[in-house]
Amino acid sequence: MKTFSAKARDVKRDWLLIDADGKTLGRLATKIASCLRGKHKPEYTPHTDIGDYIVVINASKIKVTGNKFEDKIYYHHTGYVGNLKSIAFKDLQTKNPETIINKAVKGMLPKGPLGRDMFKKMKVFVDSEHTHGAQQPKVLDI
């Protein structure tokens, strides 16, 4: 018997809706990354993109444990000498809350072209309104 290997063209992709209201950031991000990779499907193949589309709503209401709300800092470098920029979690949550979930999930996906394609299938919205009602996403409880 030959080993089954899923093909990207044969995969049926679902649309899943996740409400981030009151959820812990890391636990939510691991579930999203797992669904984007397709690990919840029986035909999972590591080298093929078979994951589902994910719509995340209420990104501004995400929670973190401990003192991370005050202490967590996100860093990025501009590429110029001495330009290491930083922003605190609480400032980022008020300014651009979808970035928090994007950074957490992107770090859990494979690096390279496959991971970039997986990441493009995640749509994050700040409040409970989203633009993907026509796709009829199924609610996924976490």
Swiss-Prot record:
Entry's Gene Ontology cellular component terms: cytosolic large ribosomal subunit
Source domain of life: Bacteria
Entry keywords, A to Z: Ribonucleoprotein, Ribosomal protein
GO biological process, alphabetically ordered: negative regulation of translation; translation
Keyword Repeat appears in the UniProt entry: no
MF term (GO), any: mRNA binding
Subunit structure: Part of the 50S ribosomal subunit.
Protein purpose: This protein is one of the early assembly proteins of the 50S ribosomal subunit, although it is not seen to bind rRNA by itself. It is important during the early stages of 50S assembly.
NCBIfam families reported in the protein's UniProt record: rplM_bact
Family, similarity comment: Belongs to the universal ribosomal protein uL13 family.
Protein name: Large ribosomal subunit protein uL13
Organism: Vesicomyosocius okutanii subsp. Calyptogena okutanii (strain HA)
